[in-house]
C-alpha cells in the first residue's frame, strides 16, 4: 500500500491553481499509482488551527516512517515552505519538534503548512530537485549561509541532489 503525503502546502482550496495537492493528483496519482492514498494538508480551509490539528493526526503514520521525501528549493533558499526572514520558519529551524506547522511566505498565497525540519530529516531517502542557474548558485553557497536549504544540505548525508538548467 502506497501512502503519499505532502511536505508542504499552500493554505488554499484544493481546487486552486496554487495547490500542490491538485498538481500531485493530476500528475502523479494516476495510472499505476491511482490506488495510492494521498493525505491532504488542507482539510479545513475555514480554520487554520483546526486544520493543523487534523493534519497532525492524519500525518502520524508519516511521523513514524517516511521512506522517500522530495524537496524543491526557491531562489531565496527556502524549502518545504520554510522561509528565510519568517518568524514561524525561524522558530522551526531552531526547534527539535517533529510535527506540522504553519509558516508565512513572502509572496501570495502567504499562509503555508509544512512539516518540521526534524520530521523531514527522519525520511529514509531525501531528494532535492531544482532547476535554474540562480538556484544552483544559492545551493553552491549554502554552506556559508543560514538559509533553510543550508540545514538540509549540511545535516543530511543521505540527501541526493538533482539539478537541471
Q: What spans do the regions from the language model cover?
A:
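Class I SAM-dependent methyltransferase SAM-binding "motif I" and its flanking Rossmann-like core
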Residues: 71, 75-117
Amino acid at each position: 500500500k502506497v501512502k503519499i503525503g505532502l511536505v508542504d502546502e499552500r493554505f488554499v482550496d484544493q481546487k486552486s491553481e496554487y495547490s500542490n495537492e491538485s498538481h500531485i493528483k493530476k500528475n502523479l496519482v494516476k495510472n499505476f499509482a491511482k490506488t495510492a492514498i494521498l493525505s491532504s494538508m488542507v482539510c479545513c480551509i475555514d480554520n487554520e488551527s483546526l486544520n493543523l490539528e487534523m493534519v497532525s493526526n492524519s500525518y502520524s503514520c508519516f511521523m513514524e516512517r517516511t521512506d522517500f521525501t522530495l524537496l524543491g528549493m526557491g531562489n531565496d533558499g527556502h524549502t518545504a515552505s520554510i522561509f528565510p526572514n519568517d518568524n514561524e520558519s525561524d522558530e522551526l529551524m531552531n526547534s527539535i519538534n517533529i510535527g506540522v506547522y504553519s509558516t508565512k511566505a513572502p509572496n501570495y498565497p502567504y499562509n503555508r503548512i509544512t512539516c518540521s525540519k526534524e520530521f523531514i530529516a527522519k525520511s529514509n531517502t531525501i531528494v532535492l530537485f531544482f532547476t535554474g542557474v540562480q538556484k544552483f548558485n544559492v545551493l553552491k553557497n549554502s554552506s556559508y549561509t543560514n538559509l533553510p536549504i543550508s540545514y538540509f544540505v549540511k545535516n543530511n548525508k543521505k540527501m541526493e541532489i538533482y539539478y537541471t538548467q
